[in-house]
Swiss-Prot record:
Homohexamer. Interacts with FPR1; the interaction is direct, plays a role in feedback inhibition of aspartokinase by threonine, and inhibited by tacrolimus and sirolimus. Disruption phenotype: Inviable on medium lacking methionine and threonine. Sensitive to amitrole (a compound that increases flux through the threonine biosynthetic pathway). Decreases survival time in an in vivo model of infection. One of its GO terms (biological process) is lysine biosynthetic process via diaminopimelate. This is Aspartokinase. Present with 48100 molecules/cell in log phase SD medium. PROSITE patterns: ACT, ASPARTOKINASE. The keyword Transmembrane helix does not apply. Pathway: Amino-acid biosynthesis; L-methionine biosynthesis via de novo pathway; L-homoserine from L-aspartate: step 1/3; Amino-acid biosynthesis; L-threonine biosynthesis; L-threonine from L-aspartate: step 1/5. It comes from Saccharomyces cerevisiae (strain ATCC 204508 / S288c) (Baker's yeast).
Length: 527
């Protein structure tokens, strides 16, 4: 899936800004006035800004436009009525236009465009209802409406508030006869080139205009939702950043950046100035909503830094995810912002663990072989069954005749799939399942430099009376994970953070590391 983009020799003076659905729903005026206009003004940090928006959500993803559109697809496949949900979406966006767009002409056009897009959705769903089937292509077409409505609104709002902007629809950027069968290198290469063509008029324009791109980027092989998931808007923003050779990709959220732990659960959690791409990927996978891993693959290979920032605190520095090894201009650089070379270098040297996160709704399956198959056949059959029912394994521990696996089961559909898989797994041996568990993951690229971190983590849990159901640690030691009861997850976060990630712990580690370095110097000098 990754592709080898070659870094160019100069910056483009562009920044790509991606805004999530809840940010668009709750803070649209702040986005335009405090962020887009600030970065795009002649004396601003960047002269050129490209905006990418997710589908609008008023409060949560569950109540957002995309979730409602997917619900319509479910109803159409069951030949049920979906008209009421479409009307809720329409009224929500019309009310939004009436509330925020002051110019009558801009408001009227926005309302008209909104109605047209939703009429198209009705046509797609009515056709599917007649056929009794909703294809992945239809799901993509219906789902794209959410990003279109969001970007139409943000374009109108920008123009209404004196920031010239133009709506750019990417839903047909992939031609229907495109031959690629998967989201592979050829697809991403094609898409970046197509995006360059879309961006060309803005790059060459004498007048500064902000392009507002739909986060949905066309009908793709296997379907966008199946192939990428709900993080496709992040990926779209990343590909646009690569296409324009951006100075920076900014992902705007409702938090100040990446913390050492969830500050809602650990009040002492600290904001991190920088993390490595590997750390960000691990934190995302094991529970922290940082950024879609596919997104990082694209921009990091193009040597473009990613900055996580807060729409409610636009002047904050945020957290930067900086490319390893080679900078955009080609020089060697450590994985941190260039403006903080010395301080970040020593911070990286001294810190063992970077952050801790938890992931709830975990089930652990233990399978003991009936010894009717060889060990490699035993494992192969297990994963064949899990793949059939689309079950994902987060952690695994194996021996020749026993396998323990931690699986995320976040909803009723996943639970149904697990029960179906359980029946097949019992053919291979005895099966027992434990539910209401949580994965606790300690993440840090430099943990392997410190002896005893895993021991300290598990000892800390034991001292707090927290039972460990399962342990997993990779050879690269970037992630140490264990499974505990879900009811103990917050206590586990707090006690491990206090032991390994607090300011006091960092100061102590710095002192110990300084002593170790001095002893090593004396040893080399033969003293």
């Amino acid at each position: 899936m990754p592709m080898d983009f070659q870094p160019t020799s100069s910056h483009s003076n562009w920044v790509v800004q991606k805004f999530g659905g809840t940010s668009v729903g709750k803070f649209p005026v702040q986005i335009v006035d405090d962020i887009v206009k600030h970065y795009s003004k002649p004396d601003g940090p960047n002269n050129n800004v490209a905006v990418v928006c997710s589908a609008r959500s008023s409060y949560t993803k569950a109540e957002g436009t995309t979730s409602r559109l997917l619900k319509c697809c479910d109803l159409a496949s069951q030949e049920s009525e979906f008209q009421d949900i479409i009307e809720v979406i329409r009224q929500d966006h019309i009310d939004n236009a009436d509330r925020f767009i002051l110019n009558p002409a801009l408001q009227a056009k926005l309302v008209d465009d909104t109605n047209k897009e939703l009429e198209l959705v009705k046509k797609y769903l009515n056709a599917s209802k007649v056929l009794g089937e909703v294809s992945s292509r239809t799901v993509d077409l219906v789902m794209s409406c959410g990003e279109k409505l969001s970007c139409l609104f943000m374009t109108a709002l920008c123009n209404d508030r004196g920031c010239k902007a133009k709506y750019v629809d990417l839903s047909h950027i992939v031609p229907s006869d495109f031959s690629a069968s998967a989201l592979d290198n050829s697809f991403y290469t094609f898409l970046v080139q197509a995006l360059k063509e879309k961006l060309a008029p803005f790059v060459s324009a004498k007048e500064r205009i902000v392009p507002v791109f739909t986060g949905f980027f066309g009908l793709v092989p296997t379907g966008l939702l199946n192939g990428v998931g709900r993080g496709y808007t992040d990926l779209c923003a990343a590909l646009i950043a690569v296409a324009v050779n951006a100075d920076e990709l900014q992902v705007w959220k409702e938090v100040d950046g990446i913390f050492t732990a969830d500050p809602r659960k650990v009040p002492e959690a600290r904001l991190l100035d920088s993390v490595t791409p590997e750390e960000a990927s691990e934190l995302t996978y094991y529970g922290s909503e940082v950024i879609h891993p596919f997104t990082m693959e694209q921009v990091i290979r193009a040597k473009i830094p990613i900055r996580i920032k807060n729409v409610q605190n636009p002047l904050g520095n945020g957290t930067i995810i900086y490319p390893d090894n080679v900078a955009k201009k080609g020089e060697s650089t450590p994985p941190h912002p260039p403006e903080n070379l010395s301080s970040s270098f020593y911070e990286k040297r001294k810190r063992g663990a970077t952050a801790i996160t938890t992931k709830n709704d975990i089930f652990v399956i233990n399978i003991h072989s009936n010894k009717k198959t060889l060990s490699h056949g035993f494992l192969a059959q297990i994963f064949t069954i899990l793949d059939k029912y689309k079950l994902v394994v987060d952690l695994i521990s194996t021996s020749e005749v026993h396998v323990s696996m931690a699986l995320p089961i976040p909803d009723a559909d996943s639970l149904k799939s697990l029960r179906q898989a359980e029946e097949k797994l019992r053919i291979l041996g005895s099966v027992d399942i434990t539910k209401k568990l949580s994965i606790v993951s300690l993440v840090g690229k430099h943990m392997k430099q410190y002896i005893g971190i895993a021991g300290t983590m598990f000892t800390t849990l034991a001292e707090e009376g927290i039972n460990i159901e399962m342990i997993s640690q990779g050879a690269n030691e970037i992630n140490i994970s264990c499974v505990i009861n879900e009811s103990d997850s917050i206590k586990a976060l707090q006690c491990i953070h206090a032991k390994l990630l607090s300011e006091r712990t960092n100061t102590s580690n710095q002192f110990e590391h300084a002593i170790d370095e001095r002893l090593e110097q004396l040893k080399r000098l033969g003293i």
